[in-house]
Each structure stands twice: as structure tokens, then as C-alpha cells.
């Protein structure tokens, strides 16, 4: 009988990937990023361990959505105080904080527990084409 090999935290290799969000559909891009963050693309994937890679996303302000979502999709946040609900459309959030759009889409695709929070910390999103992670030699993903 074969034994399942569980990787230890010392043996897990973490790579850095660079994803360009220019002219990409939001949901398809977020799915791809969430897969890399969880480590589901690796043969050593283990559901209860953080086996994922680091992902750098550039050109967040150039991400697209299909149909009328640009004018109809709403983003909600609450200050925690009575009457503190703020509602913002995709268009205005894209102008103000485009990084938050991708972060929120990916965060919803990760586990909703401490493991998901740990995996989410490996996502780095930047508005323009520049990023401060050149020393990590990220691999460009063409998809």
C-alpha cells in the first residue's frame, strides 16, 4: 500500500509569478491568480497547507469586465457605525483604487479561514506597470 506524502514547510518551493492585467477579464484573471496562490497547479498540493506561490499583478487599472458591469457592478463597504454603508460603482472604484477590485475578486476565491488569509498575503497588486519585486525574478505568465 502506498503512503501519501505530505510536504513539510521546509520542502515547499515558492516561486514568484508576474501577471499583466491589461485587457484581461476580471473573473478569469482572478481564477488564475487564486489557483497559483493556493498551489493547486503543483503536484504537491495539500488542502490544509499553504503550498502556493507569490503573485505580482501589474496594470490593475486596465482590467476589464464584460457587459454592463462597468456601470452596474456595485462594491459595498461598511464603517461599522450606524448608517455607515458606502456603495460604489465599478467605474468609480477603478479610477480611485483599481488594486482593490482585483484583491476583492481573488479574496472571494480563496478559503474563508486563516489559511486563506495567509495565502492572500502573497498577492501583490499594483496600479501601473512598475513593481518593487524585481529582485525576486518573477516569471511572466502569458495567459
UniProtKB/Swiss-Prot annotation:
Gene3D superfamilies: Ribosomal protein L13 (3.90.1180.10). Keywords: Ribonucleoprotein, Ribosomal protein. One of its GO terms (molecular function) is structural constituent of ribosome. One of its GO terms (biological process) is negative regulation of translation. InterPro entries: Ribosomal_uL13 (IPR005822), Ribosomal_uL13_bac-type (IPR005823), Ribosomal_uL13_CS (IPR023563), Ribosomal_uL13_sf (IPR036899). GO terms for cellular component: cytosolic large ribosomal subunit. It comes from the Bacteria. This protein is one of the early assembly proteins of the 50S ribosomal subunit, although it is not seen to bind rRNA by itself. It is important during the early stages of 50S assembly. Belongs to the universal ribosomal protein uL13 family. PANTHER family: LARGE RIBOSOMAL SUBUNIT PROTEIN UL13M (PTHR11545:SF2), RIBOSOMAL PROTEIN L13 (PTHR11545). Part of the 50S ribosomal subunit. This is Large ribosomal subunit protein uL13. It comes from Prochlorococcus marinus (strain MIT 9215).
Amino acid at each position: 500500500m502506498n503512503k501519501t506524502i505530505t510536504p513539510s514547510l521546509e520542502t515547499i518551493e515558492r516561486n514568484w509569478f508576474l501577471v499583466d492585467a491589461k485587457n484581461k477579464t476580471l473573473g478569469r484573471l482572478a481564477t488564475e491568480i487564486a489557483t497559483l496562490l493556493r498551489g493547486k497547479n503543483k503536484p504537491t498540493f495539500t488542502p490544509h497547507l499553504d503550498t502556493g506561490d507569490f503573485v505580482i499583478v501589474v496594470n490593475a487599472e486596465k482590467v476589464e469586465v464584460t457587459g454592463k458591469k462597468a456601470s452596474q457592478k456595485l462594491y459595498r463597504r461598511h464603517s461599522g457605525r450606524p448608517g455607515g454603508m458606502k456603495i460604489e460603482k465599478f467605474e468609480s472604484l477603478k479610477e480611485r483604487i483599481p488594486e482593490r477590485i482585483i484583491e476583492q475578486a481573488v479574496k472571494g476565491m480563496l478559503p474563508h479561514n486563516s489559511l486563506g488569509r495567509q495565502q492572500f498575503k502573497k498577492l501583490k497588486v499594483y496600479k501601473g506597470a512598475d513593481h518593487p519585486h524585481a529582485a525576486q525574478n518573477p516569471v511572466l505568465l502569458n495567459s
